[in-house]
Amino acid sequence: MDLLPAEAVRGEFAHSTTYLNTATCGVLPRDAVAEVRLLAEAAGAGIPAGFGDFDRVERVREAYARIVGVATDRVAVGAAVSTSVGLISAALPAGSEVLCPEGDFASVINPFMVRDDLKVRFAPLESLADAVGPDTALVALSAVQSADGRTADLAGVRAATTAHGARMLVDASQAAGWLPFDASPYEYTVAAGYKWLLASRGVSYLTVSEEAQDTLTPLHAGWVAAESMWDSTYGPLTRLAHGARRFDESPAFLGYHAAGPSLALLERIGIDAVHAHDTALAARYRAGLARLGHEPVPGGAPIVSVPGLAGRQGALLSAGVVTAARAGNLRASFHLYNTEADVDRLLNALEG
């Protein structure tokens, strides 16, 4: 198994449980907790350091851009994935067809569903590329399914959308941070920052290709959307930021102060190394499940879901093992702070 040095990585975190629920929310590294505490204490003391630091937000933008392989000016920062998806939905002409996988996460689907002048069509994830047709304007999908860890054939869907002149929106919330994910082939990508990217809630990312930028209107443009934001705090803005920053929301500083050290940790370790570690743990768990007579949803992601075992989640939590119940499945998700001992503890609990 290609695992990260357990003690070196575990020392970056202070959790006291067997935490196997990154697909819901990641564990904040110690350094991220310290930054949040410093900002909160400064805000409580009524000193300027409590205002929040835009330079830190820019460093987070730069780090995320490196992780997903795009230029910094292609990244917008926000607070929630659904807000960014809403921008994309609002930009579609009436009558447009949007294709989504069956059962995908609600934030990927609902911003299109609430428009009664769009045609939203669904297809099984495994045959999504075949479902793209000449009337398809946009395919919106998660790179990795939240409920069960199934991984999309993004290259196949991209080939199909290119052939039919359709755009793609990829939600990388369950991919970025463990999967080597390249956002550059897609018109739009979104990602929540509080899962595998190890920040807190209130952090999300939107990437927009240069070619697709003019397809979107920055409907929630505030002063941070201006090219010179400090000169745009009052009155109408005179010029939007030249890049994707025009789609920024005013940052939730506590989250972005946490995101800085979290992304720095991921970059220091390397996403390839995290990928090898996380998937090795998932493989160990899958093998153990087979020995116990359980059959998980097939796949190779570090999100492993077992149909029919969702009812065990409460007892596991009482035993200090944190998992999730999703779509009738018991879902365990493994990240850089987990070890083989964590996997074995879960298996032993399921056997008992």
What is each stretch, according to the model?
Residues 1-352:
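Pyridoxal 5′-phosphate
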